[in-house]
Amino acid sequence: MQCRGNNDTVEKAIDEWVDLTEKEDYRALVCDMAERMYSDKYLKAYRPLLPLLTMVQKPKDKERFITLAKSCLSCDTYESLNKIKCPTLVIGAREDKVVGVSGSIELAEKIGCELYIYEHLGHAAYEEAGDFNKRVFDFLTRGK
C-alpha cells in the first residue's frame, strides 16, 4: 500500500502489470510479478518452475484485475493514518520491488506503531519468511 502519492517503484510495477494484462500476456505477467515479489534466493530455487505456473495462472477477470491494479495508484490514505489508534504492526521487506521498503517505514511513522523489516526478502515476505505467521500471532496475542 502506498500512502502518499506514488513512488517510481510502484508506478512501474503497476503500469507493467496493467499493460501485460491488457495484452493478455499472462506468462510475462506471472514472471514479472514473481521477479518483483520474491527474493533472489527464492527465485533461484523456483524460477525453473515459472513456465509451468504461467500455464495455470491468470487473472480470473481481466477488467477487474486492471481496475484494482490502477486503483492502487490513486489510493491516498496518508492523512487518515493518524486516526488508527489500536496497536498496529507494519511488516515490510528491505528488497521489496513492488512498493519499496519506504512505504512500510512511512506507514509505521505516520501511525506511530511497531515496525518490522525483513532484511533479505521482498514483497512476498509473508510467503517466504518462516516466522511470519508466528510474528503476527505473537503481536496479536501480546498482553492477553
Residue ranges and their predicted role:
Residues 121-134:
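Catalytic histidine-centered segment of alpha/beta-hydrolase-like enzymes
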